[in-house]
Amino acid sequence: MEQYQAYLELNRSRYQDILYPLFFRESIYGLAYGHESFFIENVDYNNKFSLLIVKRLSTRMYQQTHFILFANDYKKNTFVGYNYHFYSQIILEGFGIVVEILFSLQLFSSSLRGLEIVKSYKNLQSIHSIFPFFEDKLIYLNHKSDIRIPYPIHLEILVQILRYWIKDVSFFHLIRLFFYYYYKLNSFFFPKKWIFTFFSKRNRRIFLFLYNLYVWEYESIFLFLRNKSSQLQLKHFRVFFQRIFFYEKIKHLVEISTKNCSYTLFFFKDIFIHYVRYQGKSILVFKNTPFLINKWKYYYIFLWQCHFDIWAGLETIYINEFSQYSFHFLGYFLSIPLNLSVVRSQMLQNSFLIKIVIKKLDTIVPIIPLMRSLAKTKFCNVMGHPISKPVWANLSDFDILDRFLRICRNFSHYYNGSAKKKSFYQIKYILRFSCIKTLARKHKSTVRTYLKKLSSEKLLEEFLTEEDLFSLIFPITSFTFGRFYRGRIWYLDILFRNDFVNYF
């Protein structure tokens, strides 16, 4: 067991004096310059949370004892002088920036062995391997397990996870101060809400950092168990043909299981497990017996309950068969139906009927979630009828057409691998008429009049045809190729999933 504990000692760079860039204010500005966030983008921060304000606040921290007042008067909201609640939010934003920079440098800097990490996690940084996985491996798997990641985690568990990385004592005093302050603040105004409700709405950077750190911790343990179980060597037992030796075999098995951990993992050798984390959920895809699948289910539950002190019931993990279950994944609606075909075979004077079961992958564009996403972004109403975008009405005609065309191309590029494209054509119709209504609203004209004008100028050809899809890869033979081929094409240059998938 000691040799496996050595594997569980994860490679962590334990930082000392992590609060130095925050308190010595000149360093944080230099650190943050040129190091944009690797983990999040378009977070919609309020303008008041900027590095300049954090820098000014650090100057005031030396002039007055704000932390003492901040710790004692958490229920007060001053109207004259300093607003400590406002300052605490700014400090927390600056704290999140500093910690994120340090961890991003560890993951992506060559000086901290970042090249090895990038090579080992190369498949996790892009979406290239998802579509070949659909075609080549998914149809040969049997079961799928939906895992809802339990949170919020207890705050002290988060601090313990951070202690593996950081040795700065003042850092833990500060972060406990923040947790205590916001917990008391939320319990005073909203007694039934957790602290993560506040973090997720107002301090998204530090919330995402802590959440990703928590998920990374349990995924590291799970991947360790999965890798060790698949790399175990076979341990053969003697074959006992007589019944009198049966109990001797059981006794021998129990003794081995209690002495060495590797023999207990023997039962999980050569299992086919594919793990994907997507939008707060994890997906495990198996090709094995239900007995082993249930064992991994209980491993997950015990890991959360024993290691993270989070209650996770059996309803947290759902196991379903592919042949009887369809699911949403990365913006697609996937199903693997069983197609039964009968083949007649004749041998001499005898004829046989052979039934062959063939699995086929169906990738369908989910029309209802996409229409809901378009309704939230004001491209159509809740019934799916196109509406104009008044926010874009002050732009030029070229910018309006360019924006709609870019969105339409992204949809075409992402969903061209769908087997049934009727839903995709409906989405394209909504975008096309939303563009026309926006232009007609700008020029104070009717839709019919402006549609005739655009048709005469041939400005909407790319909305009406699909040649622009093939021109992205086949610029010369796009017209001929697009006319004769209407099959499923996966584009392997997609780096990010479609933005509208976030609203699913």
UniProtKB/Swiss-Prot annotation:
Family assignment from sequence similarity: Belongs to the intron maturase 2 family. MatK subfamily.
Protein location: Plastid, Chloroplast
Example of a GO biological process term: mRNA processing
Listed Pfam families: Intron_maturas2 (PF01348), MatK_N (PF01824)
UniProt entry keywords in alphabetical sequence: Chloroplast, mRNA processing, Plastid, RNA-binding, tRNA processing
MF (Gene Ontology): RNA binding
UniProt organism field: Vigna subterranea (Bambara groundnut)
GO cellular component entries: chloroplast
Lineage: Eukaryota, Viridiplantae, Streptophyta, Embryophyta, Tracheophyta
Transmembrane segments: none
Stated role: Usually encoded in the trnK tRNA gene intron. Probably assists in splicing its own and other chloroplast group II introns.
InterPro entries linked: Domain_X, Maturase_MatK, Maturase_MatK_N
Name the record gives this protein: Maturase K
Source organism, top-level taxon: Eukaryota
HAMAP family documented for this protein: MatK
